[in-house]
Amino acid sequence: MVNFNSAVNILEVVQVSPPSSNSLTLPLTYFDLGWLKLHPVDRVLFYHVPELTRSSLISKLKSSLSATLLHYLPLAGRLVWDSIKTKPSIVYSPDDKDAVYLTVAESNGDLSHLSGDEPRPATEFHSLVPELPVSDESARVLAVQVTFFPNQGFSLGVTAHHAVLDGKTTAMFLKAWAHNCKQEQEALPHDLVPSLDRIIVQDPTGLETKLLNRWISASNNKPSLKLFPSKIIGSDILRVTYRLTREDIKKLRERVETESHAKQLRLSTFVITYAYVITCMVKMRGGDPTRFVCVGFASDFRSRLNPPLPPTFFGNCIVGSGDFDVKAEPILEEGEGKGFITAVETLTGWVNGLCPENIEKNMLLPFEAFKRMEPGRQMISVAGSTRLGIYGSDFGWGKPVKVEIVTIDKDASVSLSESGDGSGGVEVGVCLKKDDVERFGSLFSIGLE
């Protein structure tokens, strides 16, 4: 029987330090500063391992985490910003006993229910991820929670400061930790060893200073790492996962190729999937066709820079794109998938604009746009990616049966990830009220017929 009132009991909180006596100071780049005051990204990975004991689980995870932090020293440190004359930096000091806080918990909940696709209260996931302490002058970088489900398995909750890690760095760290735990060795494959070089990120236009000035202005003209307040999530918000198979994506792609007259469209899995989700979201809301919708996404820029950054570059290297004033009317248009095709064509234009010359414009635009945006405007954005390979995080007990980005309930995001079964499909996560879940689900299904 599904337990919808599951309790999570905190058993202990331990500090896990890397076996290193070296100190480290790593300044933030403008790629990091764009996300400075946004809420952390919370992920939870579910593992079905009925025969596992709590003592063996915690012992292996603690020792392998310590070994992994030797390569990922910044994650054991703190984000510090104590003077208006300096910029924020990540500081790790063994003398200050810097460490990652690992929470050990136990739940009487139903792991299969939590890791399913069906509607589940979004608040059920909040107790599976740890808090990240933040003050004006200091913020923890990473916190981890292991929740043991007796005779079922465990969940691994990871809370990461958005100004320190993007999705690619988070996925790289998780796969490195999993590798160390499974192989019981400290050596990592080359593609899981992070590059901490900051000199390679050039700032010819002074974008760092412009971003810092805007954050200082937003904090009563003083440096502050305190985050923007997060939306309070009620019990009426449900988390649901929808799936597009490889065949679904192929059919949607063929529909665009047949019906669109535009040339050189971007028909990647991301564009097809996100365009389809945008269409369903806008039609779900309905309303005045002359209304505007805010639509955005972020792209990895490591390979787009000249010269490019290494694929293993540690930190943020993502830039947002989109439009705060997308007209709903063309997307609401009925007949032959016209709204979906409009969304594909719109996304194509934004993807084509992903170039180094547009970085500053794209990173500064939100500061002005949010000031003039009226309350209640529909917002659609993306968390995650189908290219992160997050389901490859095998700690020795098999791959996760489900991965959820918990924080999509705070900011109207949808989450995208590769299908956990390796079939080439896409998992789409949404958090909506019950009536909206029913409308969105109906639109999602009908559009694939």
Curated annotation (Swiss-Prot):
Its gene? 5MAT
Q: Which residues does the record list as N-acetylmethionine (modified residue)?
A: M1
Q: Does the keyword Repeat apply?
A: no
Consequence of gene loss (knockout): Absence of malonylated anthocyanins.
Give the protein name, as stated in the record.
Answer: Malonyl-CoA:anthocyanidin 5-O-glucoside-6''-O-malonyltransferase
* Protein function: Catalyzes the malonylation of the 5-O-glucose residue of anthocyanins, using malonyl-CoA as the malonyl donor. Acts only on anthocyanin substrates containing a 5-O-glucosyl moiety. Acts on the four native A.thaliana anthocyanins, A3, A7, and to a lesser extent, A6 and A10. Can also use the non-native anthocyanin compounds cyanin (cyanidin 3,5-diglucoside), malvin, pelargonidin 3,5-diglucoside, peonidin 3,5-diglucoside, cyanidin 3-coumaroylglucoside 5-glucoside, delphinidin 3-coumaroylrutinoside 5-glucoside and petunidin 3-coumaroylrutinoside 5-glucoside as substrates.
Keyword list, A-Z: Acetylation, Acyltransferase, Transferase
Its UniProt miscellaneous note says: The glycosylation of the coumaroyl group in anthocyanins A6 and A10 likely occurs after malonylation of the 5-glucoside by 5MaT, which could explain why this enzyme is more active on anthocyanins A3 and A7 than on A6 and A10.
Which PANTHER family has this protein been placed in? PTHR31625
pH-related activity info reads: Optimum pH is 6.0-7.5.
